[in-house]
Design a protein with these regions (language model features):
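Active-site beta->alpha loop and helix N-cap motifs at the rims of alpha/beta catalytic domains
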Residues: 2-10, 14-108
Length: 108
């Protein structure tokens, strides 16, 4: 098991377009901003990112966008505890893990 870096992990907000869609270009810019400011890692999918209001597809794409943008320069953490059944929860864990995040927070 690989350990994630110790340090500062801000909880990331989710920027939206005027149409109420996730603004993935802004997500990439925000990720770069956190890295430029010296953060050790980013908590990408969390309560601050309004994860409870995002679909599974949006949560997965958000985690993937941050992970791809960070490209190993910082650790990326995601959370996933929005599912209502155990099978849905397992699916969420698998899909977010497949994005390459460095750590996953699961609240049961």
């Amino acid at each position: 098991m690989q350990q994630i870096r110790k340090g500062v992990y801000p909880t990331m907000i989710t920027p939206y377009t005027k149409d109420g869609e996730i603004d993935y270009a802004a997500v990439r810019r925000l990720t770069e901003w956190y890295i430029e400011k010296g953060c050790t890692g980013i908590f990408a999918v969390c309560q601050s990112s309004e994860m409870a209001f995002l679909s599974l597809a949006e949560r997965v794409k958000l985690a993937a966008t941050v992970t791809e943008t960070a490209n190993g320069r910082v650790s990326v953490v995601a959370s996933g505890h929005c599912a209502e059944t155990l099978s849905e929860q397992a699916k969420e864990v698998r899909e977010i893990a497949a994005t390459g995040v460095d750590a996953f927070v699961l609240v049961s």
